[in-house]
Amino acid sequence: YLAVLEEAYRKVRTIESELNLESLAPEDALRALVGFTFDHHHGNKDYIRLVMTENINRGAYLAQSKNIQALNVPAIQGIRRLYERGVASGVFRPGLDPVDIHASISALTFFNVSNQHTFGLIFKMDTQAPDVLATRRANVIDVIVRYVRAP
């Protein structure tokens, strides 16, 4: 089980590292990262379920991992570089923590999968309909960009 958890994180981090965000302007790179994360989570619902299960278990198995921090350091480093480029060019506001940016991206992209059934039932909507997903994806990207954008 621990090996499966580690591989799930390794897979997403490997794909993230191949996004070539350094070649894009900071805001475009952030949009690409958030869009990728949204799409990844939607396309890999078992990954979300795995993370949810580990959280239900209070991280008991992940706590045994000798690799999990190293697997996730590149994600934070990438966000840090992207964010610092944006601050240096004046498009992102200073004073934000890259870990918090990552947490915000994760929260907004994770919810759409983790809560699809309850949210859909409560609000009588098909949260996975293509038009609903497209609108939600655009909104999530916009929320994150507005969060980091300089005034």
Show the residue positions of the predicted features.
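Short coil/turn helix-boundary motifs
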Residues: 22-26, 44, 58, 151
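A short, mixed-charge helix-start or loop-turn motif at secondary-structure junctions
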Residues: 19-20, 61-65, 125-130
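C-terminal peripheral helix-coil segments that are non-catalytic and often amphipathic
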Residues: 36-39, 43, 73-92, 104-151
